[in-house]
C-alpha cells in the first residue's frame, strides 16, 4: 500500500515556528498543502491505484479529495488511521458536520465523535495502527491502495518520519516495519 501523509496545514506552519500547539482544531490545508496534494495526485495517477482510504480529519479528506478526483476512484473513510490525539489539531469535526461538508463520501462507519477526548496512550495508538496493518494485509488489493493519513500513523507502521505529502510504499503482509520504500521526495514540513 502507499502511505501518504496529508498536505501542509496551518497547524504545520505555526507549530513549525516554535514547536508549541497553536490551538488550531481540525486544520484545513494551506495553499501550499493543496499544491502538494495536486503533485501527489499526479504521481499516483501514474500508478495503478484502485482504492483510496482516508482519515476523517479535514486535512486528510482535502488531500484525498484531490487524489480521488484526479485518479477517479472513491474515498473510503476510516477512523482507524486518524492521528494520535496529542494536540488541538487532533480534535476532529463531528461526523454529521463532515457529512454535510462532504456529501459524496460515506461517513456511516465512524462515530459522531470519532476522536478520543484525551491524549491517546502510545500503546493504544500502536495497537490501532497494528489493527489497520492486519486488515490491509488480509485485503487482496493492498498493493493498489493509497492511504491518506498522518505522520504518527506512518511512523507507527513503518518507523519512518515523512514530510507533508511524501509517500511510502509499505507491504502490510510483513510484520516488520523495515519494509517501507520512499515513493516521492516532494513533501515539505
Task: Name each model feature, range by range.
Residues 13-14, 18, 23-28, 70-130:
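Phosphate-handling substructures
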Residues 1, 83-104, 140-143, 155-189:
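Acidic, low-complexity terminal tails and accessory targeting/binding regions
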Residues 37, 129-133, 151:
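Short amphipathic alpha-helical/adjacent loop interface patches that line ligand
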Residues 9, 153-154:
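Short active-site segment of divalent metal-dependent hydrolases/proteases
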Residues 54-58, 80-81, 110, 148-152:
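Short, well-ordered beta-to-alpha junction loops that form the rim of enzyme active sites
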Residues 2-77, 99-101, 165:
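Active-site-proximal alpha-helix that buttresses catalytic centers in soluble enzyme cores
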Residues 64-65, 137, 158-159:
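A short local structural element in Rossmann-fold oxidoreductases
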Residues 45-48, 136-143:
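Glycine-rich phosphate-binding loop signature in dinucleotide/nucleotide-binding domains
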